[in-house]
From Swiss-Prot:
Forms oxaloacetate, a four-carbon dicarboxylic acid source for the tricarboxylic acid cycle. InterPro entries: PEP_COase, PEP_COase_bac/pln-type, PEP_COase_Lys_AS, PEPCASE_His_AS, Pyrv/PenolPyrv_kinase-like_dom. Coiled coil: none annotated. PROSITE patterns: PEPCASE_1, PEPCASE_2. Its cofactor is Mg(2+). GO terms for molecular function: magnesium ion binding; phosphoenolpyruvate carboxylase activity. The active site is at residues 138, 579. The lineage of its organism: Bacteria, Bacillati, Actinomycetota, Actinomycetes, Mycobacteriales. HAMAP family: PEPcase_type1. This is Phosphoenolpyruvate carboxylase. It catalyses: oxaloacetate + phosphate = phosphoenolpyruvate + hydrogencarbonate. Its EC number is 4.1.1.31.
Length: 919
């Protein structure tokens, strides 16, 4: 570990320890220290896990609470220190004169230059460019704004301390260092006395606010900045013919994802859309206010355009002190109009004061953009480019990036849910008594007829629909209302999860038509919403291209696609495919599905846009975004990629401006490189794909033999992980299962992966791979040759390299000695011992196979920074796990007093914070 980083972690840890001793008493501090020292001894091989178990055996739950909080706070502070040093090292690397590191725009520009990429190629990519991080809710990301604020202040103080320590000794004063430490201590004291998590189950509205918090922390500033930087640099390098598209345009599922979540309603759609719009409109007002203050330019000192003079005269600011300051008068009027816009769209209660009431609201973003362009043009006319390129340029970029909607809210529902609603609508309208009972061909005929006619299916008045149907219709109604208010980009996507047929994709189109989001016109419907199938099981991934081919053979749908710029978005489900088939089989099924989709779209002249439903963990498609995008097949990106971001990953990526910039830059860099640079040429592509297919099949068999076929597996999983507690302790707003069944198939992906992460098995990220590789390599004469084949693929094929690297990353965070403690919670010892031994054996076989193929001695040999990070976290992960096991044991024995469930929640949050990608 970097010495400065180690010093910072020790420094913050020392202050935290002193705060704990002061606030909780020396006995609590000693208990924390004893646990920490014991964990270090275990890490160094000087003690066994039992010694830490003894520390907490029989502990009073009330005494366990401050210990769990202590290690959670230490994880928070360690993360803060790591982020600070990552940003500093990145800055140092960029300013060192050495070649810029991968995943930076500087490196991307060099690669494009070296490859001789022309302006025509760039223009074609940028014309359709879209890089969309889509924020989704997550049960472990429940930290309060107070905690974020404290982290922000501590980060700023640590930066100030670094600057001071970098000065020569004679140029800094001890008193200033003491002041900084006093302020850090005060912030940590406030943090210690603040509840880290809320006890009540979070409402959808709470989750919306958590998502919006990241915009205020970083995204409102950093998304416009990176879009501006990319636009300026592309124009400089490739000329003025490059479209000025805002590449990064964010999305959200929070409040619109009602797949299996009964708490998403018409009201949450309204809340999510209105709060998003309110956030961005108030941001514009704030920036206009700052511009009004800054642009004190006098028309006695420079020339202004006629358009600006007209704008200034309409600004309703006749103060004598402003008479010669046209920019201030113009922007005053723009601010008044933006406040009036906020009042008109959100409500007057959202705006302080009444002075804006004499102004006319902006009718749309184009009017606001026209005014901003007038100010920009006037400044440039008078050679004030340096002024125009600052705050005004960022505001113009913000408008291009966010519009009046901030983000695009996706609607998502399970295909069965859409079918249920239509079955009831058709029956009530006496169009078809039993839609669900029709054949696929009969359903198709009926759906096409409905989409061809403007006649509404829902009668006027108050039809007697079921509660579920009314909820669904309410969601669509409020989505349509939001589009009318905030523009078509407010709700531009409708996702069908578990899509497995053509009718699954057409069914929501009928509902969209009912509310005007699609308009019937015979065989030529028009609309503002992309209908997106989500292929998420292994079988559906394999059949996805065939389903789309059938869909595109329907004239009505193909015509709709053409008026949507011929773009077909497809979402790929990393989570459910992994749960269905295991890590390797899912990764190959996804890659193979992309190959088929790319080939199909190329042949049918359709623009493919892929939406990657990745979670934070490798078991849910996680891993470095830059590497993941570059590992896609050629043609799968083409300037556009959408990807889900959730949980601790959102906090880690977008919790402060520096990390937000770094991660947004990685997404943009990878998208440009994947779209414009030649693909890696495999020596024998057909053979490589054959190998992957064979290993995938072997891995699937091994995974299925445990997860789907072993009769004791469900018992092992439900009793050796905190799954039961996730379901019963208000962890997240969404139920943990789609249906009230006791099967892996119906369990949601987040609790599936979160449970294995908490118990430190990380099973979804590796199980089955070791056996598959060993069986494929075989024994005897051909084994060495097959190992050599795999080693060559690892060297030259980003897909295979990424699969192995991500697997190694997640395996490095597993701890099988802890998994044994969780297995001991199972009453049936035969099941506990047998399945634990199966998992234990597969883990070490997988590690052995990884080392054989990569030539490594250990899992993270090629990533020493991550290896050091994982090792440094070990001492505060262990106590959290051991406390969690002890509390789970008591909770399941009937101890439901306040402290026991509270400690389970605390340890879940602490482990998620420390692991940084637990679900």
């Amino acid at each position: 570990m970097n010495e400065l980083l180690r010093d910072d972690i020790r420094y913050l840890g020392r202050i935290l320890g002193e705060v704990i001793s002061e606030q909780e008493g020396h006995h609590v501090f000693e208990l924390v220290e004893r646990a920490r020292r014991t964990s270090f001894d275990i890490a160094k091989g000087r003690a066994e896990m039992d010694s830490l178990v003894e520390v907490f055996a029989g502990i009073d739950p009330e005494d366990a609470t401050p210990v769990a909080r202590a290690f959670t706070h230490f994880a928070l502070l360690a993360n803060l220190a790591e982020d600070l040093h990552d940003a500093a090292q990145r800055e140092q690397a960029l300013n060192s004169g050495e070649p810029a590191p991968d995943s930076t725009l500087e490196a991307t520009w060099v690669k494009l230059d070296d490859a001789g990429v022309g302006s025509g190629e760039v223009a074609a990519v940028i014309r359709n460019a879209l890089v969309a991080p889509v924020l989704t809710a997550h049960p472990t990301e429940t930290r309060r704004r107070t905690v974020f604020d404290a982290q922000k202040h501590i980060t700023a103080l640590m930066e100030e301390r670094h600057l001071l320590l970098a000065l020569p000794t004679h140029a800094r004063t001890q008193s200033k260092l003491d002041d900084i430490e006093r302020n850090i201590r005060r912030r940590i004291t406030i943090l210690w006395q603040t509840a880290l998590i809320r006890v009540a189950r979070p409402r959808i509205e709470d989750e919306v606010e958590v998502g919006l918090r990241y915009y205020k922390l970083s995204l409102l500033a950093e998304i416009p900045r990176i879009n501006h930087d990319v636009t300026v640099e592309l124009a400089r390098r490739f000329g003025g013919d490059i479209p000025t598209t805002a590449m990064v345009r964010p999305g959200s599922w929070i409040g619109g994802d009602h797949d299996g979540n009964p708490f998403v309603t018409a009201e949450t759609v309204t809340y999510a859309t209105h709060r998003a719009a309110e956030t961005v409109l108030k941001y514009y007002v704030k920036q206009l206010h700052a511009l009004e203050h800054e642009l004190s330019l006098s028309d006695r000192m420079n020339v202004i355009s006629d358009e600006l003079r007209v704008l200034a005269d309409a600004g309703q600011n006749d103060m004598p002190s402003r008479v010669d300051e046209p920019y201030r008068r113009a922007i005053h009027g723009m601010r008044g109009r933006m406040l009036a816009t906020t009042a008109a769209l959100i409500g007057e209660e959202a705006v302080e004061g009444t002075w804006f009431k004499t102004f006319t609201p902006y009718t749309d973003t184009h009017e606001f953009k026209r005014d901003l362009d007038i100010v920009d043009g006037s400044l440039r006319m008078s050679r004030d480019d340096i002024i125009a390129d600052d705050r005004l340029a960022m505001l113009r970029s913000a408008l291009d990036s966010f519009g009046f909607n901030l983000y695009s809210l996706d609607l998502r529902q399970n295909s069965d849910g859409f079918e249920d609603v239509l079955t009831e609508l058709f029956a009530t309208a006496q169009t078809e008594k039993n839609y669900r009972g029709l054949t696929e061909a009969e359903k198709l005929d009926l759906l096409i007829r409905e989409l061809s006619t403007p006649r509404p299916l829902i009668p006027h008045g108050d039809p007697d629909y079921s509660e579920a149907t009314n909820r669904e219709l309410g969601i669509f109604s409020k989505a349509a209302e939001a589009v009318r208010k905030f523009g078509p980009l407010m709700v531009p996507h409708c996702i069908i999860s578990m899509a497995s047929s053509v009718t699954d994709i057409l069914e929501p189109m009928v509902l969209l038509k009912e509310f005007g989001l699609i308009r019937a016109n015979g065989k030529n419907p028009t609309g503002s919403v992309d209908v997106i199938p989500l292929f998420e099981t292994i079988d559906d991934l394999q059949r996805g291209a065939g389903i789309l081919e059938e869909l595109w053979d329907i004239d009505l749908y193909r015509n709709y696609l053409e008026q949507r710029d011929n773009v077909q978005e497809v979402m790929l489900g990393y989570s459910d495919s992994n749960k269905d088939g295991g890590y390797f089989a899912a990764n190959w099924a996804l890659y193979d599905a992309e190959l088929r989709l790319v080939e199909l779209c190329r042949g049918r002249n359709v623009k493919l846009r892929l939406f990657h439903g990745r979670g934070g963990t490798v078991g849910r498609g996680g891993g470095p975004s830059y590497d993941a995008i570059l590992a896609q097949p050629k043609g799968a990106v083409r300037g556009a990629v959408r990807v889900t971001e959730q949980g601790e990953i959102i906090s880690a990526k977008y919790g402060n401006p520096d990390t937000a910039r770094r991660n947004l830059e990685a997404l943009v860099s990878a998208t440009l490189e994947a779209s414009l640079l030649d693909d890696v040429e495999l020596p024998n592509r057909e053979r490589a794909h054959q190998i992957m297919g064979e290993i995938s099949e072997l891995s699937f068999r091994r995974y299925s033999s445990l997860v789907h076929e072993d009769p004791g597996f469900i018992q092992y999983f439900t009793q050796s992980t905190p799954l039961q507690e996730i379901g019963s302790l208000n962890i997240g707003s969404r139920p943990s299962s789609r249906k009230q069944t006791n099967t892996v198939e119906d369990l949601r992906a987040i609790p599936w992966v979160l449970s294995w992460s908490q118990s430190r098995v990380m099973l979804p990220g590796w199980f089955g791979v070791g056996t598959a590789l060993r069986e494929w390599i075989g024994e005897g004469e051909g084994a060495a040759e097959r190992i050599a084949e795999l080693q060559e693929l690892n060297r030259c094929w980003p897909f295979f390299t990424s699969v192995l690297d991500n697997m190694a990353q997640v395996m490095s965070k597993a701890e099988l000695r802890l998994a044994r403690l969780y297995a001991d919670l199972i009453p049936d010892r035969e099941v506990a011992d047998r399945i634990y031994e199966t998992i234990f054996g597969e883990y070490f076989l997988t590690k052995e196979m990884f080392c054989t193929i990569t030539g490594s001695q250990d899992l993270l040999d090629d990533n020493p920074a991550l290896a050091r990070s994982v090792r440094s976290r070990f001492p505060y992960l262990l106590p959290l796990n051991v406390i969690q096991v002890e509390m789970m044991r008591r909770y399941r024995s009937g101890d439901e007093g306040t402290a026991v469930p509270r400690n389970i929640r605390l340890t879940m949050n602490g482990l998620s914070t420390a692991l940084r990608n637990s679900g």
